[in-house]
Amino acid sequence: MKTSVRVPVGAGLAALLLAAGAVGCAKEDKASESPEMTPAAAVAKAAKNTEEINSLHYRMTGKVPEEGRVKAEAEMQIKPTLAMSMKMTALDQGAEGTAEIRLVDKAMYIGGGPEAAKEMDGKSWIKFDLAAMGAGDELNQLGGASQADKNPATESTFLTGAKDVEKVGTETVEGVKTTHYKGTVTLADLEKSLADEDKATRDKRQKSLEQYEKMGVDKLTMDMWVDGDDQTKQFRMRGDAKKGPLDMTITFLGINEPVKVTAPPAGEVADLAEMMKESQQG
């Protein structure tokens, strides 16, 4: 088996997609109508509702630096333990642009289908033991995918830091009536705002900010579509990065529904830790 493993192109999108992905929102009792609520207050209320997320089902489409156009659909369980299943395609990358990612039992599995099997003696999945590998060099080879163990709802709070939040209008998203809000926020302002947060929140947001800093993004234009239950139904973020534009839209198809994720069949999996060990011995 080859010990020099090239992760499928789609897998390199994982961090960005997961980080930008689940901005949505825990279900709570519908708030009383409040026509006087300012755009900033409405956005803050929707962002607050992300704190009780248990699970979600969402779709993502857009563009990311280098890879270009992407689409993905995922189911994720946040509580009581993290688990995730995502199918993604980098539309401009041909056969190498399709990948499936599963996160279960503190291990990440990245499947590249037939293309990956050609390079790994017929095995189409690579296993990364996140607990054992930590932040080591091997895990860093995944780039964005190494961030899959963080709560992806963090970015939903970024719009609350915008100084120019405004109401765009009323729009229907996936058959649901929503109010569309828009604003811009700089990473510098977000960095400054961390000083007022508790350590757990500060660490979580800092981890997300670092991903954008690495891409060279210094300002984000953000849109949020909020439904009648003060929940985020759709979310969009745009920015200019060093290697191309970022423009991602996330639409929520379901929240707090059962999520079941299983590991791929053992016979189809190549364990990266074992492969690295064999390489060192060889």
Swiss-Prot record:
Alphabetized, the UniProt keywords read: Cell membrane, Lipoprotein, Membrane, Palmitate, Signal
Q: Where in the cell is it found?
A: Cell membrane
- PROSITE patterns, alphabetically? PROKAR_LIPOPROTEIN (PS51257)
Topology of the protein relative to the lipid bilayer: Lipid-anchor
What span is annotated as the signal peptide, if there is one? 1-24
A Gene Ontology CC term for this entry? plasma membrane
- From the record, what ranges are coiled-coil? none
Q: Give a yes or no for keyword Heme in this entry.
A: no
Q: Which SUPFAM superfamilies match?
A: Prokaryotic lipoproteins and lipoprotein localization factors
Give me the residues lipidated as S-diacylglycerol cysteine. Answer: 25
The keyword Membrane is annotated on this UniProt entry: yes
Q: What domain of life is recorded for the organism?
A: Bacteria
Which coarse location class applies to the principal site listed for this UniProt protein?
Answer: membrane
Give me the residues lipidated as N-palmitoyl cysteine. Answer: 25
- The protein's name is Putative lipoprotein SCO4651
Biological source species: Streptomyces coelicolor (strain ATCC BAA-471 / A3(2) / M145)
The organism's taxonomy opens as: Bacteria, Bacillati, Actinomycetota, Actinomycetes, Kitasatosporales
